[in-house]
Swiss-Prot record:
Disulfide bonds: none annotated. S-adenosyl-L-methionine binds at residues 151, 172, 194, 233. GO terms for biological process: methylation. It comes from the Bacteria. This is Ribosomal protein L11 methyltransferase. The lineage of its organism: Bacteria, Pseudomonadati, Pseudomonadota, Betaproteobacteria, Nitrosomonadales.
Length: 296
């Protein structure tokens, strides 16, 4: 059965309420794109997968998928009325041939090489190198995967620096990918915490999928103690606020690995942590940085 793809020009005020209302009105999917993409007015937005950006583009295109027999004008009118915005007038409609959407989505994600020996492999793919350390994880998970520069930066540090036998804490574990990688790289004891119970559940499932011994829970469930390595791939403001907490979890001589930080934010973050840590030069990837400090 074919579908109708409707592209609607919306502003930042309309975008989210209209998108929600369209889903309730029967849309099969709604996604937002920058209407100014590819022009001098393009607005880049940055966000880690488990902490998406709260910003919206000044002008967006809402791409709406409707069933073939849906009344487009009536659907838009009803959704706009529910959202409390003016009914959109600037839109186009095209017919989209039926496709196997699951197969199409899967075809867009290939295994991700992190280093010479470390790969992230979607569960539906064969590992390109069966001798490598292959992390089984599906791109598109709500809690983050190795497709984001901050995650890659942290994974590369773990791959280059873990020698085996370490204790490691992943603070803000999301999908558990960093903790799982640490376990595969030989860390002796690996723990992860997240404030979101669903992230904790996802991390446990992913650890089981990868057949590693890593323990996950909420922050209040974490026992007292210090670690050889603490990694936190979250965002700048939470990292700054949690400086005393994270510093207290790293043993003297141990390493703190921070990411989720834009390049222009790096100095501010290091300044907050310098009472406890001596930092290496930041490593960067696509405008994001990784900071590594050694505890005094």
């Amino acid at each position: 059965m074919p579908w109708q793809s409707v592209r609607i020009l919306v502003d930042s005020v309309q975008a989210e309420p209209l998108s929600d209302a369209l889903m309730e009105a029967g849309a099969l999917s709604v996604s937002l794109e920058d209407a100014d993409a590819g022009t001098v007015d393009e607005t880049p937005l940055f966000g880690e997968p488990d902490h998406p950006s709260a910003e919206l583009w000044p002008h967006s295109i809402a791409v709406v998928l409707l069933e073939a027999d849906a009344d487009v004008a009536e659907t838009l009118r009803a959704a706009a009325a529910q959202a409390g915005v003016a009914a959109p007038l600037d839109y186009t409609v095209e017919t989209v041939a039926e496709q196997d959407w699951v197969r199409l989505t899967q075809s867009q994600f290939d295994p991700i090489p992190i280093s010479a020996r470390l790969w992230i492999v979607p569960t539906w793919h064969e590992a390109p190198d069966s001798r490598a350390l292959n992390l089984k994880l599906d791109p598109g998970l709500a809690f983050g995967t190795g497709s984001h520069p901050t995650t890659r930066l942290c994974l590369r540090w773990l791959d280059a620096n873990l020698r085996g036998g370490e204790t490691l804490l992943d603070y803000g574990c999301g999908s558990g990918i960093l903790a799982i990688a640490a376990a595969k790289l030989g860390a002796r004891r690996v723990e992860g915490v997240d404030i979101d119970p669903q992230a904790v559940s996802a991390s446990r499932d992913n650890a089981a999928l990868n057949e590693v011994d890593a323990h996950f829970g909420l922050p209040g469930e974490l026992a007292a103690g210090e670690y050889d390595v603490v990694v936190a791939n979250i965002l700048t403001n939470p990292l700054k606020a949690m400086a005393p907490l994270l510093a207290g979890r790293v043993r003297s001589g141990g390493s703190l690995v921070l990411s989720g930080i834009l390049a222009e934010q790096a100095e501010d973050v290091m300044a907050v942590y310098r009472p406890w840590f001596v930092f290496d030069a930041p490593a960067s990837d696509e405008g994001w940085v990784r900071l590594v400090g050694v505890k005094r």
